[in-house]
């Protein structure tokens, strides 16, 4: 996003769904109490949320209630985790720019979200900070705490959150994947929750890299999209010394999205008021498109919020949603390593039209 823009908390939250049991010659046994089936590597993880006709979340389903298809071919469900099993959450706090006045609100909202999680659920947190490199300040990604179930340690980490002078949004998402979502070696579900407007200002990475990193992990991605555009546009007009600026990378991205061929100024201060507003409008549209795309592809959701005061309700909805998410896993019957995208479809047996199913849409197969 832009330097000094009202930024928000980005919560990344993690679902651990990888199986650890070695696959021997005998098939893994099913545990009747929690309908758990556990197997091994190269498992395709599929988070699934089921709702009834009025949108209420449905609990109590079993592995035998589901069917999963890959490119139209039914697959054998090798792993099933119920909605009662714990999950891991990573919170990414975006407190760049003018959110200085909102830090207490951000901390309270995050603290309530943590308190609403169940025993056994764990949390990790990432935030932004300002580093000084070669005499110049630069926004950076900061790991506040690794995944932990210690609520006291988490609240202490929240107290240490400060502000930054930029928004390395994409870098932070990649950092969450690398430092909090990967590995662990435990049979836990994972989910990523992001609170913010989704507009990057200082990252070295791009959205495509975020997609490439997150989609293979098989986690559901949720966004609380906070509308910061009115604040930004109010500050875009007038003296450039006080106006919010986009990075050179974002300006190039803006012109590229329009297919513009003419050489344009990469200095935001040299743009006129109307072009600054056009840049703002288009970059927010791109951010909205990216959030919707990633959430839909992974089986997550986007929760709109006009400001931070609505974040608490959105957090509560997400906590309920991920607390009733099932996790299916299968080994693809297509053994080709062709690097092609494979579409996933999940259905409920004998309940067609009665319940709605939201699930991961697909994945890209490995290539030789």
Where in the sequence are the language-model features?
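N-terminal secretory signal peptides that target proteins for export/translocation
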Residues: 1-6
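Bacterial N-terminal signal peptides
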Residues: 9-19
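Scaffold/interface architecture of coatomer-like assemblies
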Residues: 22-368
């Amino acid at each position: 996003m832009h330097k000094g823009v009202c930024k928000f908390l980005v919560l990344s939250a993690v679902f651990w769904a990888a199986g650890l049991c070695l696959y021997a010659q005998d098939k893994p046994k099913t545990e009747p109490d929690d309908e758990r089936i556990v197997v091994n590597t190269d498992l395709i993880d599929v988070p699934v949320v089921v709702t009834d006709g009025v949108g209420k979340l449905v609990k109590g389903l079993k592995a035998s209630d589901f069917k999963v298809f890959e490119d139209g071919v039914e697959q054998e469900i090798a792993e099933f985790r119920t909605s009662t099993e714990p999950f891991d959450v990573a919170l990414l706090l975006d407190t760049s720019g003018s959110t200085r006045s909102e830090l207490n609100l951000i901390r309270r909202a995050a603290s309530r979200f943590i308190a609403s999680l169940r025993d056994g659920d764990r949390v990790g947190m990432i935030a932004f900070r300002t580093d000084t490199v070669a005499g110049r300040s630069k926004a950076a990604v900061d790991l506040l705490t690794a995944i932990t179930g210690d609520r006291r340690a988490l609240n202490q980490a929240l107290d240490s959150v400060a502000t930054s002078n930029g928004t390395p949004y994409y870098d932070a998402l990649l950092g969450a994947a690398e430092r909090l979502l990967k590995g662990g070696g435990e049979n836990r579900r994972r989910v990523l929750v992001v609170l913010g407007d989704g507009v990057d200002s200082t990252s070295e990475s791009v959205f495509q890299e975020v997609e490439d990193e997150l989609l293979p992990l098989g986690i559901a991605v949720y966004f609380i999209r906070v509308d910061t555009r009115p604040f930004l546009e109010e500050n875009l007009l007038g003296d450039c010394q006080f106006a919010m600026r986009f990075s050179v990378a974002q300006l190039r991205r803006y012109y590229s999205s329009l297919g513009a061929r003419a050489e344009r100024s990469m200095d935001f201060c040299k743009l006129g008021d109307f072009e600054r507003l056009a840049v703002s409008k288009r970059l927010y549209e791109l951010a909205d498109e990216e959030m919707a795309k990633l959430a839909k592809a992974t089986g997550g959701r986007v929760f709109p919020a006009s400001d931070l005061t609505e974040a608490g309700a959105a957090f509560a909805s997400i906590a309920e949603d991920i607390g009733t998410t099932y996790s299916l896993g299968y080994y693809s019957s297509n053994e080709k390593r062709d690097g092609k995208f494979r579409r996933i479809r999940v259905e409920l047996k004998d309940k067609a039209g009665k319940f709605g199913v939201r699930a991961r849409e697909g994945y890209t197969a490995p290539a030789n």
